[in-house]
Amino acid sequence: MDIVTLAEVAGNLNVVGYGLAAIGPGIGLGILIGKTIESTARQPELGGRLQTLMFLGLAFVEVLALLGFVAAFIFQ
């Protein structure tokens, strides 16, 4: 392998790393939204409060994806 090929492979590893970093928040969002819907079905009177807490949790989970995205550029 020449140096150009190695540089191309090393550049593509950042993309793979971000793809793996995005899996965790994706799974977290699915679990969070699913449990909120399940809880609202069990206790409809708490729907508004559960929705507020869900959006707060969504913000925290999305921060993980953004950190992975930023890290891909920083460690490039």
Swiss-Prot record:
Key words of the record: ATP synthesis, Cell membrane, CF(0), Hydrogen ion transport, Ion transport, Lipid-binding, Membrane, Transmembrane, Transmembrane helix, Transport
Chief localisation class: membrane
Subcellular location, record wording: Cell membrane
Residues that span the membrane, as ranges: 13-33, 55-75
Molecular function GO terms recorded: lipid binding; proton-transporting ATP synthase activity, rotational mechanism
GO cellular component, one term: plasma membrane
SUPFAM superfamilies in alphabetical order: F1F0 ATP synthase subunit C (SSF81333)
Membrane association type: Multi-pass membrane protein
Site (Reversibly protonated during proton transport): 62
PROSITE patterns: ATPASE_C
HAMAP family the record matches: ATP_synth_c_bact
Assembly and interaction partners: F-type ATPases have 2 components, F(1) - the catalytic core - and F(0) - the membrane proton channel. F(1) has five subunits: alpha(3), beta(3), gamma(1), delta(1), epsilon(1). F(0) has three main subunits: a(1), b(2) and c(10-14). The alpha and beta chains form an alternating ring which encloses part of the gamma chain. F(1) is attached to F(0) by a central stalk formed by the gamma and epsilon chains, while a peripheral stalk is formed by the delta and b chains.
Record's function text: F(1)F(0) ATP synthase produces ATP from ADP in the presence of a proton or sodium gradient. F-type ATPases consist of two structural domains, F(1) containing the extramembraneous catalytic core and F(0) containing the membrane proton channel, linked together by a central stalk and a peripheral stalk. During catalysis, ATP synthesis in the catalytic domain of F(1) is coupled via a rotary mechanism of the central stalk subunits to proton translocation. Key component of the F(0) channel; it plays a direct role in translocation across the membrane. A homomeric c-ring of between 10-14 subunits forms the central stalk rotor element with the F(1) delta and epsilon subunits.
Similarity comment text for this entry: Belongs to the ATPase C chain family.
PANTHER family documented for this protein: ATP SYNTHASE LIPID-BINDING PROTEIN, MITOCHONDRIAL, ATPASE PROTEIN 9
Protein name: ATP synthase subunit c
Organism: Bifidobacterium animalis subsp. lactis (strain AD011)
Gene (UniProt): atpE
